């Protein structure tokens, strides 16, 4: 359990370090960003399909946004401040297709993160995932919007 906590702390540190770099300055205005890292190759996970859903009043999930991670393993521009309203969201990463493209047979069909957004006022969210063929770990960085 202690090693998992240390791992998550290190992963959060990587996110903060990349946010502080020069490349993160313009992207800090993005209200929802996804970062995916490949733990096997020690590199960004490129071309991972990402789908975002929003929970409706009747409990079903409606498509909200989608895209693929870039060379950096990041996906920006999923939504705008105006559209990213209070609610419950689900981020789904197509991990099976990612590993299959690398010739690896994975255990999981996909990785998902379900979270409540903006219930304490408007915030920006970075969802980070560390993938391996038989496991995944996620963390989030929630911050105030940058002007």
UniProtKB/Swiss-Prot annotation:
An example Gene Ontology molecular-function term: hormone activity
Tissue: Detected in serum and cerebrospinal fluid (at protein level). Highly expressed in the choroid plexus. Detected at lower levels in the liver.
InterPro entries assigned to the protein according to its UniProt record, in alphabetical order: Thyroxine_BS, Transthyretin/HIU_hydrolase, Transthyretin/HIU_hydrolase_d, Transthyretin/HIU_hydrolase_sf, Transthyretin_CS
Biological process per Gene Ontology, one example term: retinoid metabolic process
Pfam family, one: Transthyretin
Residues that, per the record, bind L-thyroxine: 35, 74, 137
Record bears the keyword Endoplasmic reticulum: no
Membrane-crossing segments per the record: none
CDD domains: TLP_Transthyretin
Residues recorded as bearing 4-carboxyglutamate in the entry: 62
Residue numbers bearing the Sulfocysteine modification: 30
Annotated Gene Ontology cellular component terms: extracellular region; extracellular space; protein-containing complex
Further information: This protein binds retinol-binding protein at levels similar to, and the thyroid hormones at levels much higher than, the human protein.
Quaternary structure note: Homotetramer. Dimer of dimers. In the homotetramer, subunits assemble around a central channel that can accommodate two ligand molecules. Interacts with RBP4.
The protein, known as: Transthyretin
Organism: Rattus norvegicus (Rat)
């Amino acid at each position: 359990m202690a090693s998992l906590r240390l791992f998550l702390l290190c992963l959060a540190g990587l996110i903060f370090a990349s946010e502080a770099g020069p490349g993160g300055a313009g992207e800090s205005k993005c209200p929802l960003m996804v970062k995916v890292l490949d733990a096997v190759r020690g590199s960004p996970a490129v071309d991972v399909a990402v789908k975002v859903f929003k929970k409706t009043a009747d409990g079903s999930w409606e498509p909200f946004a989608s895209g693929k991670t870039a060379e950096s393993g990041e996906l920006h521009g999923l939504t705008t401040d105006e559209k990213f309203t209070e609610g419950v969201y689900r981020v789904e990463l197509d991990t099976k297709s990612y590993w299959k493209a690398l010739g690896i047979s994975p255990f999981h069909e996909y990785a998902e993160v379900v979270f409540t957004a903006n219930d304490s006022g408007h915030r920006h969210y970075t969802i980070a995932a560390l993938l391996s063929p038989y496991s995944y770990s996620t963390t989030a960085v929630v911050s105030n919007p940058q002007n």
